[in-house]
């Protein structure tokens, strides 16, 4: 391929991806208010969720992406995050005395998750549970919320305001389904530059 053809090809690629990026449109303040109200109303009717998930983590320290798969179940204020591939273990979030506690279940044993890993999952659990119940969008003390549209899909960009969350994440994107009552994908950009993307499939609500 000569230089001229290569230059044209690169320009076309740039235009293609540039056009794709521009398809994410920020909502107006009026639209954002109505979108958040619609999501809160829709999610308030969701009492339980069961689904599969695929988690892809891109670390700044590693060249290859790390992919995990599993199942998630949510009911009330409790969340179970069960990994089935490549390793088998479960993370369980329970509310005890008004505070979220994280436990690890593996090889028939249960232990409390402490330290950095426990704090990280508490943050993830807070985001997932907040998106399910709608509190992540309505609680202005935790996040600054910006709403976007991409075709018919609604996307919420959350920027943490709480010091604990700011230490873990710089931004979170929530992708909602067509009924706006559940999140189908979560993108979390961590403060250290790592990126975690969680995609939910085979979702069952209130089953």
What are the functions of these language-model segments?
Residues 4-10:
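Sec-dependent signal peptide recognition
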Residues 11-20:
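Hydrophobic h-region of N-terminal signal peptides that target proteins for export
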Residues 21, 136-207:
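Gly/Pro-enriched, hydrophobic low-complexity segments
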Residues 23-28, 35, 40-45, 57, ...:
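Flexible, processing/modification-adjacent segments and terminal tails
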Residues 46-48, 67-69, 76, 86-88, ...:
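Extracytoplasmic
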Residues 48-72:
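An N-terminal domain-cap segment
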Residues 55, 83-87, 95-97, 106-108, ...:
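A mature extracytoplasmic/lumenal domain signature
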Residues 69-126, 196:
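An acidic-aromatic
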């Amino acid at each position: 391929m000569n230089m001229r053809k290569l230059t044209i090809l690169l320009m076309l690629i740039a235009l293609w991806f540039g056009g794709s990026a521009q398809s994410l449109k920020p909502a107006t303040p009026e639209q954002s208010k109505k979108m958040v109200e619609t999501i809160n109303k829709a999610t308030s009717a969701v009492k339980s969720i069961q689904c599969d998930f695929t988690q892809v983590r891109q670390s700044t320290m590693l060249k290859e992406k790390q992919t995990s798969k599993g199942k998630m179940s949510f009911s009330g204020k409790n969340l179970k995050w069960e990994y089935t591939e490549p390793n088998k273990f479960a993370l369980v979030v329970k509310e005890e005395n008004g505070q979220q506690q994280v436990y690890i279940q593996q090889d028939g044993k249960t232990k409390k998750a402490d330290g950095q890993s426990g704090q990280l999952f508490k943050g993830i659990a807070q985001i997932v549970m907040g998106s399910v119940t709608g509190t992540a969008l309505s609680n202005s003390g935790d996040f600054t919320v910006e709403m976007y549209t991409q075709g018919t899909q609604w996307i919420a960009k959350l920027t943490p305001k709480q010091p604990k969350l700011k230490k873990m994440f710089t931004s979170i994107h929530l992708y909602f389904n067509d009924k706006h009552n559940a999140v189908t994908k979560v993108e979390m950009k961590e403060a250290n530059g790592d990126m975690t993307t969680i995609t939910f499939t085979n979702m069952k609500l209130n089953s």
